[in-house]
Amino acid sequence: MPDINNDVVAANFSRASRSYDLVAKIQKECCYKLVAMIRERLPHFMPASVLDIGAGTGYLTKLLLSEFPNACYTMNDISYEMLSRAREMVGESVSTILGDMSKVKFPVSDLIVSSMAIHWSSNPITVLKRVCRLSKVFAFSILVQPSLYEWNRLFHELSLPSPGLHYISSEEVELAMLDTSPTLFTWEVCNFDMRFASPKEFIRYMRQLGSNYSPAGFNAYHVRKVLKHAPGEFFSKYSVMFGVVSRSHF
């Protein structure tokens, strides 16, 4: 998997810090589902400390605050502007850690969560394993193959290099989590279909999310060729793997 330029990723998310919540419908659905999975799989679990990795604007932390109001919370993100928005959402009492999830030394926490973020790491398997071993419970959602395959296919049809991230498979994630010797591991993959008036609208959507990073770099000529090649409606989907991992008995 090619290395991801974290400076570019951080800049993209910083620019999107005010538009993100306006378009992040699926991302918010994933947060709701993740909280529901924690409650359903571990109904007696009451964490004293919660760490949200790749917290973005703080939506997942806000939901967890309602479920576990007495816990101490910490949010991490690579974007300062995203963390500023998150503090506006959840309050100044929540601690924050600015930095790249693959490099930050995170504290041991009862509950570590991450929703739609770890696929932005150059080595998501390493991050998943490391974070899991720092927690009693680790709950996550992550994009897996074949997410956004339709976008890459438009480029392949014109013999152009793929602009998208290389997503790992759900099987790779499953093996990584089992390697941590959990007492409980439950997971599922859900597909979220998306429809846009045109590929150009899809590009706009990704920019508003801050998700417009391309490991291959932005090539305006290639994009113009794709837009000319496929001017009509554009359909794509997110394939999201949800998991709850426990390494303790409750």
Curated annotation (Swiss-Prot):
CDD domains in the record: AdoMet_MTases (cd02440)
UniProt superkingdom: Bacteria
Gene3D superfamilies: Vaccinia Virus protein VP39 (3.40.50.150)
GO biological process, one term: methylation
Any one GO MF annotation of this record: carboxyl-O-methyltransferase activity
Keyword annotations: Biotin biosynthesis, Methyltransferase, S-adenosyl-L-methionine, Transferase
Annotated catalysed reactions: malonyl-[ACP] + S-adenosyl-L-methionine = malonyl-[ACP] methyl ester + S-adenosyl-L-homocysteine
Any Pfam family hit: Methyltransf_25
Keyword Isomerase: no
Pathway where it operates: Cofactor biosynthesis; biotin biosynthesis
Listed EC numbers: 2.1.1.197
Function: Converts the free carboxyl group of a malonyl-thioester to its methyl ester by transfer of a methyl group from S-adenosyl-L-methionine (SAM). It allows to synthesize pimeloyl-ACP via the fatty acid synthetic pathway.
Family: Belongs to the methyltransferase superfamily.
PANTHER family from the UniProt entry: TRANS-ACONITATE 2-METHYLTRANSFERASE, TRANS-ACONITATE 2-METHYLTRANSFERASE-RELATED
Listed name of the protein: Malonyl-[acyl-carrier protein] O-methyltransferase
